[in-house]
Curated annotation (Swiss-Prot):
Part of the ribosomal stalk of the 50S ribosomal subunit. The N-terminus interacts with L11 and the large rRNA to form the base of the stalk. The C-terminus forms an elongated spine to which L12 dimers bind in a sequential fashion forming a multimeric L10(L12)X complex. Belongs to the universal ribosomal protein uL10 family. Transmembrane segments: none annotated. GO terms for cellular component: ribonucleoprotein complex; ribosome. It comes from Chelativorans sp. (strain BNC1). The keyword RNA-binding applies. This is Large ribosomal subunit protein uL10. Keywords: Ribonucleoprotein, Ribosomal protein, RNA-binding, rRNA-binding. CDD domains: Ribosomal_L10. Forms part of the ribosomal stalk, playing a central role in the interaction of the ribosome with GTP-bound translation factors. InterPro entries: Ribosomal_uL10 (IPR001790), Ribosomal_uL10-like_sf (IPR043141), Ribosomal_uL10_bac (IPR022973), Ribosomal_uL10_bac_type (IPR047865). One of its GO terms (molecular function) is large ribosomal subunit rRNA binding. GO terms for biological process: translation.
Length: 172
């Protein structure tokens, strides 16, 4: 990689560290190309991305970003998984690591908070933004449904009383 290319790569990586919801750092020694492509496609489907960068360039890109505290994680063959959704990258990386011993999560960051491997796994267990939005919409709709039932209940009760009188008159 030439010097100009390195500058561009560091600048793009710096933007990643500044603008993403979460970053996961993991070692990938022993992953086959097919496994790496599988990880990349799963991450892409979840709205994230995976990059492999030289540790020295990643450390330079981290300078001046909220995620600066994770520089110590960049040792050996490391990859960076990131997404705008704070839960997506940790979730996909953790699920992939469960099925593949060659991917070892070292840690990560969510904003200015540095996370160890257990912190990343804990973050992965949280519901995603879409799941949280669905729960909130459900909680908002539930009271409206109950109000509609309460408003319609007196009319239904009145109809049952009238129906009972009608059956009583028919029986007599």
């Amino acid at each position: 990689m030439e010097r100009a290319e390195k500058r561009e790569f560091v600048a793009s990586l710096n933007q990643v560290f500044q603008n993403t919801g979460s970053v996961v750092v993991a070692t990938y020694a022993g992953l086959t190309v097919a496994q790496m492509n599988d990880l990349r496609s799963k991450m892409r489907a979840a709205g994230g991305s995976v990059k492999v960068a030289k540790n020295r360039l990643a450390k330079i890109a981290l300078q001046g970003t909220p995620s600066e505290g994770i520089q110590a994680l960049f040792q050996g063959q490391t990859l960076i998984a990131y997404s705008d959704d704070p839960v997506a990258a940790p979730k996909i990386a953790s699920e992939f690591a469960k099925g593949n011993d060659n991917l070892v999560i070292l840690g990560g960051a969510m904003g200015a908070t540095a996370l160890d491997a257990e912190g990343v796994k804990a973050l992965a267990s949280l519901p995603s933004l879409d799941e949280l939005r669905a729960k909130i919409v459900g909680m908002i709709q539930t009271p409206a449904t109950r109000i509609a039932q309460i408003v319609n209940a007196p009319a239904g009760q009145l109809a049952r009383v009238v129906g009972a009188y009608a059956r009583k008159d028919e029986a007599a």
